[in-house]
C-alpha cells in the first residue's frame, strides 16, 4: 500500500503536472512581455497560480493542465472562480501599489504536446 504522498500516487503525479504547467505558463507569459508579479500565492481564502502584469493590466491567471484543452477549459468551476476572486482581493490588500491597475481574470490551458493557450478575460466578477 502506498502512502498518500508517494511518488507514484495519483495526487503526487497531478501535483507535479501542475507545477510543470505553471512553470511553462510563466515562461510563455514572459516571452510575450508579461512581468510575473507572483506565483503560487496562497491565503486562507484561496490560491492564485500566477499574477502577471503588462502595461496597466494585472492578470490573475488560473492554470489548468489536462489531457486535452477542452477538458482543461471546462475545469474552472464557478466555486473556484469565487475563491480566486477572494484571493485576488486579499492579494491586493498586500500590494496597494497594484490596486490602480485593471484587474483581469485569465485562464491558461495546458495539454501534452501543445503550447499553452492563454484565454484573456475568461470571466468577470459578478456585480
Please state what every model-predicted region is:
Residues 40, 64, 106-108:
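Solvent-exposed beta-strand sheet faces enriched in polar/charged residues
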Residues 1-39:
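Acidic-basic catalytic patches of nuclease active cores, encompassing PD-(D/E)XK
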Residues 69-99:
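Mid-chain, well-packed structural core segment of small domains
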Residues 6, 31-58:
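Active-site metal-binding core of divalent-cation-utilizing nuclease and nuclease-like domains
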Residues 48-72, 84:
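Conserved catalytic cores of phosphodiester-cleaving nucleases, focusing on short active-site segments
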Residues 95-127:
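Domain-level recognition of nuclease-like catalytic cores that cleave nucleotide substrates
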Residues 37, 72, 115, 119:
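Glycine-rich, flexible loop/turn motifs
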Amino acid at each position: 500500500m502506498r502512502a498518500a504522498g508517494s511518488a507514484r500516487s495519483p495526487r503526487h503525479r497531478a501535483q507535479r503536472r501542475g507545477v510543470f504547467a505553471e512553470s511553462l505558463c510563466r515562461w510563455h507569459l514572459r516571452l510575450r512581455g508579461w512581468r510575473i508579479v507572483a506565483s503560487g500565492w496562497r491565503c486562507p481564502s484561496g490560491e492564485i497560480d500566477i499574477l502577471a502584469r503588462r502595461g496597466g493590466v494585472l492578470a490573475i491567471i488560473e492554470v489548468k493542465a489536462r489531457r486535452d484543452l477542452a477538458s482543461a477549459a471546462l475545469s474552472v468551476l464557478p466555486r473556484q472562480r469565487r475563491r480566486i476572486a477572494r484571493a485576488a482581493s486579499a492579494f491586493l490588500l498586500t500590494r496597494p501599489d497594484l490596486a490602480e491597475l485593471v484587474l483581469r481574470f485569465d485562464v491558461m490551458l495546458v495539454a501534452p504536446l501543445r503550447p499553452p493557450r492563454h484565454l484573456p478575460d475568461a470571466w468577470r466578477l459578478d456585480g
